[in-house]
Amino acid sequence: MEIELAKSYGFCFGVKRAIKKAEQIKDAATIGPLIHNNEEITRLWKNYNVKTLNDISELSTEQKAIIRTHGITKQDLEKLKQKDIEIFDATCPFVTKPQKICEQMSKEGYEVVIFGDENHPEVKGVRSYVSTKAYVVLDEKELFDIKLPSKIAVVSQTTKKIEKFMEIVNFLMLKVKEVRVFNTICDATFKNQEAINELAKKSDVMVIVGGKNSANTKQLFLIAKNYCEDSYLIENEKEIQKEWFSGKEKCGVSAGASTPDWVIDLVLEKIKEYTKIN
């Protein structure tokens, strides 16, 4: 069986930057997981004593705090600054961008439509910078019954599909007098999605590696599933089942933006081991 890696996969710029920062800082706490990958979070805790807290209120004896790649809310940032603690900001610059846009557009009197999951930490952070009114939606249908203002700015969660973003933008262009559109979907997301789209079309089994709480990884899985019915989302090599590859000729492999190379390598080794048996 042939195994092919997607042309673009794995660690993005923002995640690489955050991991490097955490390894250099050491002996620190992050507010929420630094990235959405349990394997890497465990490695940082064991090797660098970087632990994960659920909330700022859990900070006690820690001397250093790292802000997660997804960012935190404006209000939580203010709370953190009031603590007697050294702060290191690992927010991805691609996430900081929509935060700044929302803050500026609000000052100019625009209400803001955010394409994203309202429960995702990145979206919570971005929304907190809107001082007018924010509408968080996953579909243009959610805007049908809303009385929209004459001025709207539109941003997206960085890991969403560009096609869906455009559907929302097109709807608003027909309904609102003035629409300011900011494409805040990051380049790595676009490249990874494009690559898995291409690979899934020519594979008869797909394995996507990444955190099951990772938005970008789940998006890759959905794209793969659309073209390859036998697509599987796993966090590590232990979840792989050899039956997946029975009678298959080509296995495509991709990974989310928070998935480290060492995890991907273990997955590839396990697939090779199982396909030798077949």
UniProtKB/Swiss-Prot annotation:
Pathway: Isoprenoid biosynthesis; dimethylallyl diphosphate biosynthesis; dimethylallyl diphosphate from (2E)-4-hydroxy-3-methylbutenyl diphosphate: step 1/1; Isoprenoid biosynthesis; isopentenyl diphosphate biosynthesis via DXP pathway; isopentenyl diphosphate from 1-deoxy-D-xylulose 5-phosphate: step 6/6. Isopentenyl diphosphate binds at residues 36, 70, 120, 214, 216, 258. Dimethylallyl diphosphate binds at residues 36, 70, 120, 214, 216, 258. InterPro entries: LytB/IspH (IPR003451). (2E)-4-hydroxy-3-methylbut-2-enyl diphosphate binds at residues 36, 70, 120, 158, 214, 216, 258. Keywords: 4Fe-4S, Iron, Iron-sulfur, Isoprene biosynthesis, Metal-binding, Oxidoreductase. Pfam families: LYTB (PF02401). It comes from the Bacteria. [4Fe-4S] cluster binds at residues 12, 92, 186. It catalyses: isopentenyl diphosphate + 2 oxidized [2Fe-2S]-[ferredoxin] + H2O = (2E)-4-hydroxy-3-methylbut-2-enyl diphosphate + 2 reduced [2Fe-2S]-[ferredoxin] + 2 H(+); dimethylallyl diphosphate + 2 oxidized [2Fe-2S]-[ferredoxin] + H2O = (2E)-4-hydroxy-3-methylbut-2-enyl diphosphate + 2 reduced [2Fe-2S]-[ferredoxin] + 2 H(+). GO terms for biological process: dimethylallyl diphosphate biosynthetic process; isopentenyl diphosphate biosynthetic process, methylerythritol 4-phosphate pathway; terpenoid biosynthetic process. It is an enzyme of class 1 (oxidoreductase). The active site is at 122 (proton donor). Its cofactor is [4Fe-4S] cluster. PANTHER family: 4-HYDROXY-3-METHYLBUT-2-ENYL DIPHOSPHATE REDUCTASE. Catalyzes the conversion of 1-hydroxy-2-methyl-2-(E)-butenyl 4-diphosphate (HMBPP) into a mixture of isopentenyl diphosphate (IPP) and dimethylallyl diphosphate (DMAPP). Acts in the terminal step of the DOXP/MEP pathway for isoprenoid precursor biosynthesis. NCBIfam families: ispH_lytB, PRK01045.1-1. This is 4-hydroxy-3-methylbut-2-enyl diphosphate reductase.
